[in-house]
Amino acid sequence: MWGFIVTCGIFLVLLCQLRLLSKRKSKSTPYNALLPNVTVFAMGGTIAGCANSSLEIVNYIPGSVGIEKLIEAVPAIKAIANINGVQVTNMGSENLTPADVLKLAKLILAEVAKPNVHGIVITHGTDSLEETAMFLDLTISTAKPIVVVGAMRPSTAIGADGPMNLLNAVAVASSNQSMGRGTLVLLNDRIGSAFYTTKTNGNTLDTFKSYEAGSLGIVLNQKPFYFFSPAVPTGKVFFDIYNIKQLPRVDILYGYQGLNPKLAESAVHLGAKGLVLAAMGATSWTDDGNEVISSLIREHNIPVVYSHRTAEGYSSNSCLGIPSYFLNPQKARYMLMLAISSGYSIRDIEGLFSIK
């Protein structure tokens, strides 16, 4: 008798568990073999930010929402791709370090090596988004789409741009038309090359622009429309980061009237292995500042790249060091860091930045 009761009890427990499992399964989205597989790596930022009011778009806490909630907020994504969300970090992008970006790049390299993965999306804070995007563009050699996306309004705001940006990013990463275009930046319906796209305004939605290079395309109704066939930006190279454990320190110095010429020397004494100058005009640096730079190059073999503090422009080869040509300081910095990590000599670095 007791055996029968125990057996019935076990049966009821199993039945309840099966019902719970069936309910859980009914809430989840079944895998659709007809849809592409897209992996979303979450880094935090405004797109995952929260404020105390739906009217607040300035004072909020970035990196407050996890990847699961971000995906749940955009149900339409499930009709575009099978999504695999991975939380890498969850912070404002001003706090990201080269170590974080190196870790992300290696995770992406492992993911794109999987034959069933069609594309990658990275949700990211906009403050340093272009830096991460540039690093990925220089280190991920794949035809598969890699799309970096962010938002200018927190997730709690009326008219939050994050959900639509994320939906469009997944659409771009799912499209065969996005193949072979390198790392892309997607915000406000515009698709740009990571090599040229930069943040131009700290507040407005239409902040990411590519200036002279122009946008690669736009997204309409979750369909990417490209203006050009896939092309490689002039001067773009790939660096193998498989054996890189730590990136060298490279500092950016800003040019201005009355510049302290000793700042460059101090940066090197504090551990900088290379310098990027956000120079005035094309590549103008103060005379006494150039004397210090010359000494650092000659005595310490420090590579110094001259970029420009202007929003756009060309850094000419009339400077004392290595001109960045069309790369802004923050993009030139990561290229220099990777070159130093890869054992490039100063002459090699000159060739790397030169436009043939």
Swiss-Prot record:
UniProt entry keywords in alphabetical sequence: Cell wall, Glycoprotein, Hydrolase, Secreted, Signal
Q: CDD domains annotated for this entry?
A: L-asparaginase_II
Q: Which residues have a glycan attached per UniProt?
A: N37, N52, N176
Q: What is its main location?
A: secreted
EC identifiers of the protein = 3.5.1.1
Cross-referenced Pfam families: Asparaginase (PF00710), Asparaginase_C (PF17763)
Write out the catalytic residues in the record. Answer: T46
Where is this chain's protein located in or outside the cell?
Secreted, Cell wall
What are the recorded GO MF terms, alphabetically?
Answer: asparaginase activity
Protein family membership: Belongs to the asparaginase 1 family.
Q: What GO biological process term is on the record, naming one?
A: asparagine catabolic process
Per UniProt, substrate binds at S93, T126, D127
Protein name, please? Probable L-asparaginase 4
The leader peptide range reads 1-22
Query: What enzyme category does the UniProt record give?
Result: hydrolase
Q: Which SMART domains match?
A: Asparaginase
- Organism the protein comes from: Schizosaccharomyces pombe (strain 972 / ATCC 24843)
Catalytic activity, per the record?
L-asparagine + H2O = L-aspartate + NH4(+)
Q: Which PANTHER family match?
A: 60 KDA LYSOPHOSPHOLIPASE (PTHR11707:SF28), L-ASPARAGINASE (PTHR11707)
Asparaginase/glutaminase domain ranges (all copies): 36-356
Q: Which domain of life is it from?
A: Eukaryota
- Looking at the keywords, is Cell division present? no
Give an example GO cellular component term for this record: extracellular region
Reply yes or no: does the keyword Coiled coil apply.
no
